[in-house]
């Protein structure tokens, strides 16, 4: 998983890219991803935002996985101006989260045990159930790669392969869920305090993405300050910022003085501001916990930026 080319005279093709445990997991990702996408596109069907997200997630993961396997097999990854170990570790974690979400959403919104009344309804049901099974297998294939490539205690590795690096991807993913709930009629603009919370989410998200981007591009060595120290300082600040949001957001959304402590009975399903506010509150605490765990692990990581 290094970023250097083989010495002259070596084999041009790297068979270990498809025969090693990690390579086998990637081949299975391609097989399961293509099967899932094809089943849904051919007869299973999809609709709405949820279906579009699932298809986009599967298509994106398949395309990048194919690129990774091709570059590993032909040893062309050494020609790319990025840290290959950081890139593959970050993508595997992101793909795991995307495929996990799709593996939950597609069966929840589209899979049914009963046949639909339209012609060939039972065939569509069978295709959707099969797609749901392969979507779950696809998630497991990416999760296996994350488990195989994760840095072990005492092992020197690329930053994104450490627990702290993997948590950065999860933090950014959770922040995207928060943003999705915020734009879905959460009424965050009513108070300056809730606007502060949005600023916290945005600032921490941008900083996390910057850390991931610098690691993947291999530019962590030219910052004028040790990268691991910067990561620890930023993570500590993120914990403080999220702690403030974890206190402020519930008060200004669910306290009787400012908001609704209970879900309004006349609130329509799918378009209720209270639901969006609850989602934001829950995932604020999730991200706070992730940053606390990240801070604990950041104290003892050892990594090589160029891997």
UniProtKB/Swiss-Prot annotation:
It comes from the Eukaryota. GO terms for cellular component: cytoplasm; membrane. The keyword Repeat applies. It is a multi-pass membrane protein. This is Myeloid-associated differentiation marker-like protein 2. Pfam families: MARVEL. Belongs to the MAL family. Its main location: membrane. The keyword Aminoacyl-tRNA synthetase does not apply. Keywords: Membrane, Repeat, Transmembrane, Transmembrane helix. InterPro entries: Marvel, MYADM-like. The chain crosses the membrane at residues 53-73, 90-110, 129-149, 163-183, 198-218, 229-249, 278-298. It is found in: Membrane.
């Amino acid at each position: 998983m290094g970023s250097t080319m083989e010495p002259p005279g070596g084999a041009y093709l790297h068979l270990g890219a498809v025969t090693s445990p990690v390579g086998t997991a990637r081949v299975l990702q391609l097989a399961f991803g293509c099967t899932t996408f094809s089943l849904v596109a051919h007869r299973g069907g999809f609709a709405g935002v949820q279906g579009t997200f699932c298809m986009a997630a599967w298509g994106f993961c398949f395309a990048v996985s194919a690129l990774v396997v091709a570059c590993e097999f032909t040893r062309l990854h050494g020609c790319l101006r990025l840290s290959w170990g950081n890139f593959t570790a970050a993508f595997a974690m992101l793909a795991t989260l995307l495929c996990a979400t799709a593996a939950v959403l597609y069966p929840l919104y589209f899979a049914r045990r009963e046949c639909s009344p339209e012609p060939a309804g039972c065939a569509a049901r069978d295709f959707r159930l099969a797609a749901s099974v392969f979507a779950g297998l696809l998630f497991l294939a990416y999760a296996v790669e994350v488990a195989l490539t994760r840095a072990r205690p005492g092992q020197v590795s690329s930053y994104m392969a450490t627990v702290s690096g993997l948590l950065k991807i999860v933090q950014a993913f959770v922040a995207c869920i928060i943003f999705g709930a915020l734009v879905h009629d959460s009424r965050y603009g009513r108070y300056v305090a809730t606007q502060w919370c949005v600023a916290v989410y945005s600032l921490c998200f941008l900083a996390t993405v910057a850390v991931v981007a610098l690691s993947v591009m291999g530019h962590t060595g030219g910052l004028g300050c040790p990268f691991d120290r910067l990561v620890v300082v930023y993570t500590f600040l993120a914990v403080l910022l999220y702690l403030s949001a974890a206190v402020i957001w519930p008060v200004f959304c669910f306290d009787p003085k400012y908001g609704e402590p209970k879900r309004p009975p006349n609130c329509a399903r799918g378009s209720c501001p209270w639901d969006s506010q609850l989602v934001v509150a829950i995932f604020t605490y999730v991200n706070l916990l992730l940053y606390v765990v990240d801070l604990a692990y950041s104290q003892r990581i050892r990594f090589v930026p160029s891997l």
